[in-house]
Structure formats: C-alpha cells, structure tokens
Amino acid sequence: MVPSIHPIPARRSQVLRRGINLSHWYSQVFSRKGYTPQHFDEYVQASDIALIAEMGFDHVRFAIACEPMLQAGTPSHLPADYVARILSVIDVLHAHGLAVIVDIHPETPFKQSLSESDDALADFVTFWEVFAGHLAGCDPERTFFEILNEPCIAGDARWNLIQGLAIQVIRRSAPDHTIIASGNDCSQIPELLKLDAPVDRNVIYNFHLYDPIAFTHQGASWSPPWAMSTKGLTYPADANDVAVLLDSVFDEKARVKLAEYRDANWSAPVYQSFLAPAIAWGRQHGVALTCNEFGVYTEFSPRNSRLAWIADISRLLSQNGIGWTMWDYAGSFAVATGQYGQRSPDREVVHALGLVG
C-alpha cells in the first residue's frame, strides 16, 4: 500500500508552489562590505521584498551562512543582534504575504569540516538546536527549516547521520515546524533517491535541477573548465546548432558534453522522463517534494533558450505537483535587474515562470 502524504506537510507545501532564492544577501556575500549591517541594509531593501510579492511569488528561500554567527558566538550562544536581524527579515517577508524557507547555506570549507570532524558535526547539531529555538516563534505555517544547502559530505551514510541528528534536535526545539530535507552532494535527483526512508513525517523532501550543466552553466567561471567552451548552446537541443558549436570547440571534454547534450535531445518530454524517478520516489514514501534551485546563468546563454528552459522546467514541476524556487532574485541567474534599491522585474522571465506580475 502506497503511504499518503502527512496532512501537515501536504498542506504547507501549498505555500511553496512558486518561489525565488534570496541569494548573496546573508550568504555567499561577494561585496567587500562582507557580512555587515551596511551590506544587509543595501543589498535587499523593502522595495525588493515588495517587488518579489508583486511579481507573483508565494515564497522565498532565505539563504543564510552560519559561519558569521558561529564566528561571533558559539554553537550554543548565537549572537543576539545577528539573530534579531534574521527574525526581522522573516517578519518583513511574512508581512508581504511570503512564506520563508530558512536555508543554511555555508561555504565549502564549512561543509568539508562536517565531513572530516565529529566535533564539527556535534557543533552543527548544537547550532541547529539553538537556532531552531530562536525561530520557533515564527509562524510554522509559513516558515520552513532547510538543514543544509548542497551538503557535499564525504559519504552518503555520514550525510544521512548528520541530517537525521539535525532533524531530531530541530524537532525538540521547534516541534511544529516543517523541515526541508535534501540529498547529499549537489542535492540532485540521484542523491534524493539515496536518502533514508523518512522517520519524521513533518518533512518535505527537496532536490535541485541544473541538468545539463553544459546548458545551464555555460561560461560560468566556477563550473568545470570545459563549460567555458559551451557558450551559446541553445535549448531545446538542436543537432544543427550543436554542430555549429562543435566546429569551433577544441576542448575534448567540452566536445563530449556537447555530443551528449545533442544525443539526449534535451526538451520538455525528456525532462518529464528525467523527473519521473523523483516523482515515483515521493509517491513510494508518501512525501511532498520541492525543487528549490533551478535556473540558467545569464551572461552567455542565448536569451530565448534561457526563457524556453525556465518555462519548461517551471511548468513541468508545477504539473507534477512539485513546488519550485528559481535561482535567483538579483544575482547571475536573476529574475530582477538593476542596482540596489532600483531593481525592476525582467518581465520575460516572470512570464516564462507563468507569473503575471
């Protein structure tokens, strides 16, 4: 007998249908100002939050690096001023009708320490127990706790251990809130399928979708070096377009990836098949699913191809009952353009997402 989704996450998942990632605000801060009040006050302003709501999103994924809190305090005594700022942001988002995924989003060295050190693991679990206690007063119908972005932990068994311990302590500190759990590594569909069967029923399970990197991350400097040679790749896959690119690409790995892209014939029907294992896994375990990262790097991707990809992915996720959160609001995958305090919607992206704002 196939289990049914627990009524609490089933209900709450309905406020996670269409969202946007608030990146580079409280995590992955590239500004020279760093994690300072000046950066926090400038990068996302009240006008931005109002704009997100006006565009038609129902939630945001609020990415938060835990390192600044731990450097200014300890796992058991987090800095009161920093926590107060986070709580204030959540209040403002709620006031604009937006649900909030509180996403712990550290840098790679922090995640490496979780892989290697049992002391770091214990500190992280303590951090979540204390942090969840601070957040326990936030409306549980509209506030979700995501344990760790793209864990990249050495060994799936260790990640299952870390995530399981975090769920236990969050549940002690915030018994009513819904938790977002994800697979290891970059939290893609194959990693979702490796997760332990759920024990705590008030959990929504999550994956990220950037396949194939040859298209979504073409020209991105942090991607594998071969991705610098896939600039201009179009979507849906077109053999003639790929042939033109191959004529000017000499990196052997890039040539392999371009040929794979052509042969896979990436298109909406292919993505429906690609999603099928995740959909089946969710039904098998009786859990709600979200995809809280997907997107296309803007700088080198052909505009119409990027719009077509965003439209196909968001539509397919919605049609299959999977809530989605696009990456990102105002970074290099953006739905909004312009500088601090003067941002405006990219209307074509908004419409590609099926929104009317």
Language model segments and positions:
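Gly/Pro-rich active-site loop or hairpin
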Residues: 36-37, 41, 231-232, 267, ...
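Short, surface-exposed loop/helix-turn segments at secondary-structure junctions
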Residues: 37, 221-223, 304-307
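Hydrophobic beta-strand scaffold residues
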Residues: 100-102, 289, 324
